[in-house]
Structures are given as structure tokens and as C-alpha cells.
Amino acid sequence: MVAGAALATSVRKVRPQSASKRTIVDAQVHFWKANSSDWAWDPGTRPQLPEPFTIERALPMMDEAGVDRVVIVPPGLNDRNDYALEAAKRYPNRFGVMGRIPLQDPKSAALLPTWKQQPGMLGVRVTFNTPPTLAWLSDGTADWFWPAAEKAGLAVMFLAVGEVPRFAHIAERHPQLTLIIDHMGLNSSSRDNRITENIPAAIDQAIALAKYPNVSIKFSGAVGNSLEPYPFRDMTVYLQRVFDAYGPQRCHWATDITNSFVTASYRHRVTHFTEELSFLSESDKDWVMGRAILARLKWA
């Protein structure tokens, strides 16, 4: 607690008292309830933590860390968005939702024109991280989605294990479709991933999409993939490369905190960016820490 207080004091000293408060928005956090008869997970799926990560657990963490808002990304345990939307309904100034959709069913296209009429819904998050879902990118299963989402004016966050280059064609063909790369293009935000993934190559692939103005990127893979303690210096070179390619208005601070609790406190996840990355100016931090994702998702 003493260290956290010292960090908070350090952050306050960075900005003049006359400056407006920086809005801090975490662009990715998973919420889920306990497994029960009315909240059943799909077979073969499991949560990132043994216990639920709930609204009531998140709010005090946010307050302690100085996080103003969170983009809830429902976990890939099923295609349900109801608990995330409940959070947004109860706390509309704190939570918004990037909802999941049954991508394998073309009939889901009928949901998109009114998708954002659901209170708190900001867009869609799609995942291609298993052999069956990865196949959707090449066998035509997902083809219906990109023009439908573009027509509906929806922002789309995507996780595509090893297949980020495929999105160059999607970004070019659908220039009005807002695309947001998860985890800096890395396979996950877990340090176990470091054993198998060529991180420099994955970063190269993500940077290659920076030429498309409709593409932006989340930093959610940074801390979880670090093999060092705070302030995670081994990831700084990758953060700077991504930032230099995309610029402050297309880079989004995100924690995926439930995937990396053991790595750092929530407050450290904030100060990592606000205090430890010398290549970021104060204006850059304003964009990266919240202003950019609010603009990208049109979240007022």
C-alpha cells in the first residue's frame, strides 16, 4: 500500500495542478460470474482465474488504481453478453461492452444493424484462437461479417492467433470498418506465450497494418508477456515500435488484467505507462491512456 501511495503521488506530480484530469480507460477486461445452471460455460472452456471476476470486484480495484472506465470484453466461455451489459446498465459512466456474436452463423447479420441500440454496447469482439475458429478466416465462414459490420458502423476488436496479416485485406477492402488489434498482435497476454511465440515477428506483422487508418492497436499483450518484474523493460522496445508505427491516437492502453494478476498490481499497470515509458509525452499519454479508445469507439 505504501508503494502504491508513492506511485500515485508520483503521477500527480507529473501534471500541473491546473491541467485537466487525464481520463484513464482500460480497453480490455473480462468479467464473468460463477459457473451455475443459468451461467454455464461452453464445454472445454475455462476461466482465467479459479474465482469469478465480477462487477463488485472490479469497481474498488478501478478506484484504487485511478481507472475511470473499462471496456468489458466478455470472455470466450460462451457468446453471452448479458452480464457485461448488466454492468454497463448499472454503471454507465464506468463500463462499456465489446460484445460477442455467433460468428459461425450468418443469421447473426440480422443483429448488427441494431447492435448498438443495446445500452452500453460499443461494438463487437471476435476471436480466432483455436483450430476451428482460425479456419473461419480461410473457409469463408467469417466472410459475411466484415461488410455487415462496416455497414452497421461497428468497431471490431479481434484476436487472430498467427493470422494478423489476413486483416490487411479486410482493412483495405472495408476502409470504413474500425478494426482494433488485440494484444499488440501477440497470441495472448500471458507470459507462457513467450515459450512458443516469436514476438519480434508478431510485432512486425502488427506494425504492417499501421498503414491502414482504420486499424488501431491495444497494448494488452505488454505486461503479461514480460519476463521481467515491474517496469517490464524487456517489452519497452516492442511498445515503442508499435507506438512509433501507429501514433498516439491509434494506440490503446489495455490490461487484460485477469490474465496477469501475478505479474503486477492494477496500479502498476497504470504507472507502467504514465511513469516508466520515456518515449511518451504527456499529450501522448492522454491519448494512449483513454482519449484514443473513447474516440475510436465513439464512447461519450
Regions found by a protein language model. Name each.
Residues 25-27, 72-73, 98, 125, ...:
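Active-site neighborhood of phospho(di)ester-bond hydrolases with catalytic His/Asp-centered motifs
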Residues 1-12, 22-27, 43, 47-69, ...:
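Mid-to-C-terminal alpha-helical segments outside catalytic/metal-binding sites
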Residues 52-60, 106-115, 202:
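Short, acidic/polar
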Residues 33-56, 61-65, 118-127, 177-178, ...:
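Active-site gating loops and adjacent loop-to-helix segments of metal-dependent hydrolytic enzymes
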Residues 68-69, 78-162, 169, 218-222:
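Active-site gating/metal-coordination segments in enzymes
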